[in-house]
Amino acid sequence: MTKVAVLKQDGSQAAELELNDAVFAIEPNNAVITDAVLMQRASMRQGTHAVKNRSAVSGGGRKPWKQKGTGRARAGSIREPQFRGGGIVFGPTPRSYAYRINRKAYQLALKSVLSQKVAEGKLVVVDALSFEAPKTQDFKKVLANLSVDTKTLVVVDEDNENAILSARNLTNVQVMTTKGINVLDVVNADKLVIVQSSIEEIQGGLA
């Protein structure tokens, strides 16, 4: 079992926690991590690109010249693709880029990135993050006590609204609930701060 220190909000050690090696100490699978990141990034695309084909371009209802006798190539509309200002052939249309990978593959990717953070010493476990009211300065003070000063992902309980609101104005800090933890955000974070109860919930869902 991998052991990590459980810190208080003031930075002192409260206890020691044994992590489940099946979740936090596996051999990372880089191929599956890549698949999961690409899936999430593809799902984030708006896919609103569009151009007009010949039926969508305005004008061109009149035949530009008669069919025969002019020596020119026949044409039925000045909005045909070969004309300047004409429609586009096989251009991009709005579509969704979202796709899914297997649930087990995604879970393996999540366990892989969590294991990487533990191996690199970038996981910080806190016994609790409690604030009397939403206040950014209080949240910054806690991060300073935990020696966290880089791009950070903080994972808290579902009902910890004060912590979520306190971090909204911090540019390098992202706070999410346990159910929202995902591969892309864990990969992008330099530090991972997780509340102890969330660690137990993550292990219960992935072990």
Swiss-Prot record:
The keyword Signal does not apply. It comes from the Bacteria. GO terms for molecular function: rRNA binding; structural constituent of ribosome. Residues 48-75 are annotated as: Disordered. One of its GO terms (cellular component) is ribosome. Keywords: Ribonucleoprotein, Ribosomal protein, RNA-binding, rRNA-binding. Pfam families: Ribosomal_L4. GO terms for biological process: translation. InterPro entries: Ribosomal_uL4, Ribosomal_uL4-like, Ribosomal_uL4_dom_sf. SUPFAM superfamilies: Ribosomal protein L4. Belongs to the universal ribosomal protein uL4 family. Part of the 50S ribosomal subunit. One of the primary rRNA binding proteins, this protein initially binds near the 5'-end of the 23S rRNA. It is important during the early stages of 50S assembly. It makes multiple contacts with different domains of the 23S rRNA in the assembled 50S subunit and ribosome. Forms part of the polypeptide exit tunnel. PANTHER family: 50S RIBOSOMAL PROTEIN L4, LARGE RIBOSOMAL SUBUNIT PROTEIN UL4M. This is Large ribosomal subunit protein uL4. The gene is rplD.
